């Protein structure tokens, strides 16, 4: 039945819609990642809209941006990482999610334990059992990083449960392209 619906949608030019969630604890760069993806790939972006994009501040609630790539519309949700937001976003964790990008700050040792707990919580959700996860080790460009990324992954994250890991610096378009390619392929 899904095949028939998909065929009819494609026949009449309808878009496939994919829901992507960007999750993680606070101050890890989720909103910056969302707007960098939007800036990089939005087909409708102009100089005016680029300058009017919000300066990322800690998100209270959520942000949603949509981009279209090759007949696929991606609704990308960035949900604030404060504990009060994380309690609320758990209501959105359904099997309708197509992929999850879990972001953590690889330069902040103090936030890694909290990130580990949140990641484990998400991976244990039955509704997310078949949802692919991308683990983004963000802020690779910051000099205060004292632990190597392999050590972080070994200590704080179950490598066997990770579909893919991307080391990211927000100013590096190659990292951003890897992230976007992963979203598109999952």
Swiss-Prot record:
GO BP annotations of the record are: intracellular protein transport; vesicle-mediated transport
| PROSITE patterns, per database record | ARF
GO molecular function annotations of the record: GTP binding; GTPase activity
Per its UniProt entry, which superkingdom is the organism in?
Answer: Eukaryota
The alphabetized UniProt keywords are: GTP-binding, Nucleotide-binding
Q: Report residues binding GTP.
A: 24-31, 78-82, 138-141
User: What are its GO cellular component terms?
Assistant: cytoplasm; Golgi apparatus
Q: What does this protein do?
A: Binds and exchanges GTP and GDP.
| Protein family per UniProt | Belongs to the small GTPase superfamily. Arf family.
The record's listing under PANTHER family reads:
ADP RIBOSYLATION FACTOR-RELATED
Q: What is this protein called?
A: ADP-ribosylation factor-like protein DDB_G0292332
